[in-house]
Amino acid sequence: MDKIIKSIAQSGAFRAYVLDSTETVALAQEKHNTLSSSTVALGRTLIANQILAANQKGDSKITVKVIGDSSFGHIISVADTKGHVKGYIQNTGVDIKKTATGEVLVGPFMGNGHFVTIIDYGTGNPYTSTTPLITGEIGEDFAYYLTESEQTPSAIGLNVLLDENDKVKVAGGFMVQVLPGASEEEIARYEKRLQEMPAISYLLASKNHVDALLEAIYGDEPYKRLSEEPLSFQCDCSRERFEAALMTLPKADLQAMIDEDKGAEIVCQFCGTKYQFNESDLEAIINDKA
């Protein structure tokens, strides 16, 4: 089961989140039938949103949009504070040549664009923030968002590793943040450790990458695990929700579906689930609108 572990240095100088998101990204790949580069780009976006959602309180919903002018198209993810995330990528078929080590490149092909976040607190006034894509690698773009929009300097690492058949082998990441009150000496020590950390791909390839991430982040410094919470890919779509959407259409449009298509098929963008509405279903909706 996927999980996020929240921790804090015993000194109180900084905190860290580490994630195992393997099942989340594997299920997203399965549902959307994504090829290698699309899988990694979508996976990184899902992991970034899992981190962002874990930083919120209450019943907030968080939307992350990675909008570039590349062949990937838009990448959209929605998460809640209960560990659930869903998402899709417009172009599922991007399969760009890998590096000599087999790693999938994303940044050089993302193009210009923006990292957009929408945090809905349920009050009717969602908070929206837009920052430019800095590298297109998504992790660095997420870190830039945290620094610019939330005024919280953060170190972010996230990635998706694929096997020889381009299926998800492992996915995960981390976030490290300096906390208020940290001394200059503690900040310098933290920055030095991050600079010396192995690459995220190397750490994810470890037998237990969650422990490997924690060890790389804290080194010999004592720390406390604050919580361990489950994560999952979960879509909240339903037949009832799409039926309500059909109710908003003009009667003429619904009648055209009956006359021309003998019904309607609606496919959820986020999970690919198909919902069928036959002629009788559509006629009932028309009658309900009367």
From Swiss-Prot:
InterPro entries: Heat_shock_Hsp33 (IPR000397), Heat_shock_Hsp33_C (IPR016154), Heat_shock_Hsp33_N (IPR016153). Under oxidizing conditions two disulfide bonds are formed involving the reactive cysteines. Under reducing conditions zinc is bound to the reactive cysteines and the protein is inactive. The keyword Membrane does not apply. It comes from the Bacteria. GO terms for biological process: protein refolding. Disulfide bonds join C235-C237, C268-C271. Keywords: Chaperone, Cytoplasm, Disulfide bond, Redox-active center, Zinc. It is found in: Cytoplasm. One of its GO terms (molecular function) is protein folding chaperone. SUPFAM superfamilies: Hsp33 domain, HSP33 redox switch-like. It holds the Pfam family HSP33. GO terms for cellular component: cytoplasm. Gene3D superfamilies: Hsp33 domain, HSP33 redox switch-like. PANTHER family: 33 KDA CHAPERONIN. Redox regulated molecular chaperone. Protects both thermally unfolding and oxidatively damaged proteins from irreversible aggregation. Plays an important role in the bacterial defense system toward oxidative stress. This is 33 kDa chaperonin. It comes from Streptococcus pyogenes serotype M2 (strain MGAS10270). The gene is hslO.
